[in-house]
Amino acid sequence: MLTQRVCRILNANVTVRNLSIVQASSVSSEKRKDSEQPKLLSSIDDIGVNQASKPVFQVIGSPATVLNVSIPPSYPLYVSKGSIISLNSKDKHSVLDSLVSQTRLINPIKRTLFGLINFRYEKIFSTIPFNALVSSSVSTFSWGSSSKIVRQRSFVSLDLDGRLDWAVFPPKAVQAYAGDNLTITNPFLPKSLTKFPRVYTLISGRGLLSLTGEGQIYKITLGNETILIRKENLLAISVNGNSEIPQSLKNVNLNKELKEGSREQISSRPVLKYFSQAKDVITSSYRYLTGNNQYIKVHGPRTLLLSTNSQLESFHYKNGQGSENYFSLAKSIGFANPEPQPKDYLKVVTIEKGEIKGYESKNSFLEEQKQQAQ
């Protein structure tokens, strides 16, 4: 369940409805049979190459940090540049013999100038069916230091049938999509939602789409009601075109609304009133620069995707300076991550006849050599 810091429900009357908040791995606007619903896979066991005429997106693990994509022949797959882990095919010929890869830039100038950093995608298609494993990791260079921040992210897949569009807000959320029937545009956010010109991603049409968000991803089905969502946690919402955004979203400063009553109590004291006004000016200036404690009021009915905005980060230093002090400080205050074990990064993948049959963690590769020797 999400904490109150993530979302708050505004009840306009006495009637209270139990809000549905579930962890999301796949979201579809079509009703399917249970046997057709995409399932969350715990490992890469029994993943076969897709022989059907439609692509299949399946998330792997918990959290879902890997996406398995099955693509039929001559069907284009678009993935964020540098996120492909592996490619394989069941065909007797190598997937490299028929694979075509092209770089595609999506609105590079507009995205760079107005807040969407990720505009480089790789278009991949082949004359034979193939599988691709896609990573959710995104490396970000930290300005002013010699480090890179690698944030923990997870996948959610969307199946668009043309009836609903999706508005996606984080700058690096669109990780992969399949087909040429999806339209991706970058309209400007309404002035009521941002102080500076910024764009978001609007996806419409038919096809499969995979988003990534920090931490876990949850789905909220909103009825004819209103909900407050912390800005950093809002991943995407379902909409009917770009024109619906101004009526569906509104900026809310939660601290300002909660403290209105306390201001009335000190208004009769001139000295306290002066210090209160000075504090408000400083606080408002700080929030103007940092966007702290800003919420978005979302009006239903619609579907929302929220990310828990995990703060678990690992720092990779280029020259090692400062790393010793950082880890000693983290350990002393009790926030250090547990010591990594060999099985956390040693993996054995078994491939038979072009299919991935097994995926295991090992403490040592010597164990695998002994098993093969026997």
UniProtKB/Swiss-Prot annotation:
The keyword Chloroplast does not apply. This is Altered inheritance of mitochondria protein 24, mitochondrial. PANTHER family: ALTERED INHERITANCE OF MITOCHONDRIA PROTEIN 24, MITOCHONDRIAL. InterPro entries: AIM24, AIM24_sf. Its main location: mitochondrion. GO terms for cellular component: mitochondrial inner membrane. It is found in: Mitochondrion. The keyword Mitochondrion applies. It comes from Komagataella phaffii (strain GS115 / ATCC 20864). The gene is AIM24.
